[in-house]
Amino acid sequence: DPHLYNLKIFLENENSIIDTYELKIGIRTIEVKGDQIYLNGEKIEFKGFGRHEESPITGRAQNLPQSIMDHNLLKWIGANSYRTAHYPYSEEDIELADANGFLVINEIPAVGLFFDDIKENIDIRLELCRKQIHTLINRDKNHPSVVMWSVANEPFPLDLLNRMKDGKNGPADEISTNFLNTLIEDAKTIDNSRPVTLAAIHGTPLDWLENVDVILLNRYYGWYFAQLDLDGAIEKLSNELSEIHDKTNKPIIISEFGADTIPGFHSVSDELYTEEYQLEYWKRYLEYAKKTDYVVGLHAWVLADFRTTHSTMRIGGLNHKGAFT
């Protein structure tokens, strides 16, 4: 239920107006208390999707009609939020979120950060990310729809494969931890009115989550792991999130979960890529979140199918996890 106000600023010189600037603003509070998030003093649950600014006609170029359609689809399906995965969206898109009352997790283009590089290159990358945070916050700080800053999506620890294999969550290396902590602290220093987060891949060290305000977890139990075993998938999800919550006592948003689906592909029994499996997959995650108090949000991956690299995993060069095709 958005309420926007027109703020006008006048520059005068000897009683003459020589310039004006007009900005639509909204007034709201967002804060984290314990393992809950509060909007205007009331608990809020994040219900929505990860998105891409993409059109089948114009690709990743800005397309305002496509943005309007996306926001209409979000409203129609009952969503209240989305993440700008995995880069800043156009300011026109954020203005649409303001006007429609969506909550936006705003993310810099730090996707799949790797740290197995020489120090000089890592330092260059860090300065670039710091500049991106500064630029993004300065651009979007006056948008009421923006309620959280995300400093990275799925950074990779050096020993990620071993962590995913044995399920152990030991301390991370010092280089990557310092890198991410620097970005988190920068965001908090520039804007202390919004929570700061990062979207964590399976196997992320808990060290990386110590300084975030809200924990975002990208989890694909039932798709990349425990395929066709949704009972086992939810059990693994529940066990992992329970351990993370016990050690952090922070609100958790499942920021990605999904199953690729080919339109029109059906099966009576569980079968990957069928519409039935995708629906059951989503249903299980929703049921788990509903009964888990510290899971304060779900963002399905993804709002609509999108173009990606050609591979044996990507039928037709598309990611087919979209709720819409």
Language-model regions, residue ranges each:
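Flexible, active-site-proximal loop/turn residues at the rims of small-molecule/cofactor binding pockets
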Residues: 11, 31, 55, 88, ...
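Secreted/periplasmic carbohydrate-active enzymes, especially glycoside hydrolases
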Residues: 1-104, 132-138, 142-148, 164-167, ...
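Substrate-binding clefts and catalytic carboxylate motifs of secreted carbohydrate-active enzymes
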Residues: 145-150, 159, 166-190, 196-198, ...
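Short low-complexity, flexible loop/linker segments enriched in glycine and/or proline
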Residues: 96-100, 119-130, 213, 268-270, ...
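Alpha-helix capping and helix-loop boundary segments enriched in small/acidic/polar residues
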Residues: 58-62, 88, 120-127, 170-175, ...
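A short acidic, helix-capping loop that chelates divalent metal ions and anchors anionic groups
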Residues: 53-58, 113-117, 157-160, 224-225, ...
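Short, small-residue-rich loop/turn micro-motifs
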Residues: 43, 48-53, 106-112, 153, ...
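Aromatic-lined substrate-binding rim segments of carbohydrate-active enzymes
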Residues: 70-126, 174-194, 231-242, 246
